[in-house]
Amino acid sequence: EDNLDQRYAHATGESVEEVWFLSKHVASSERPCLTVHPIGVPHLSSEEKPPFGGRSGRAPPPSPRMSAIWRSLLKVADDPRIPDFEVSLEVTHHGPWMTTPCAFLEIGSTDSTWGHPGAAEVWLDVLCELLGDEFEGVQSPVLNADLPVLITLGGGHYAPRANMMASEPHAILGHMLARHSLLFDQGPDGEVGGTWREAVDEVVRSTRAAHPGR
């Protein structure tokens, strides 16, 4: 559902700084996996209805901690509790809409793995380590203004280029647009159209919103 951050803040009086959705991942491959990704449907025109929520042409700010989550997940990729699981980033896709920085943290890809105890324990360890480090004074990536923030364009859904770049500690990952979200068409006069330009502009705006002052 859209605007969960605002609705929670209104109901509780508490401000919402960041949202992590612990969710199920669905894939036709049915491979067991743990995935991380930002959300949004910036490639859709205003006439198109998003099939899985969100606002057409918009992308919520990505979690500034997404790269840190990914690096922590890589550390436990060979954990014996998840012997058959792969780990991967995914590109920006689906809803809901919100204005608070967010990310989806998922277990996939079928009902036989959605309730996998080892996968749930690994995710718990990843998040506890990340938050525990911050509580103990380790600098949050949100506060490190010296690190560049990256946006990736092109490639497939599982973002192999972003997987590699975000594994390094010297950069922060923002939105990722796969080639299927960069829609081009050519008019009769040869001019290139499509929603690709609007999609790029939106993820740049959204990523900047997640990192004010950069």
Annotate the PLM regions:
Residues 1-99, 110-111, 117-121, 128-162, ...:
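N-terminal catalytic or cofactor-binding beta/alpha core of small enzyme domains
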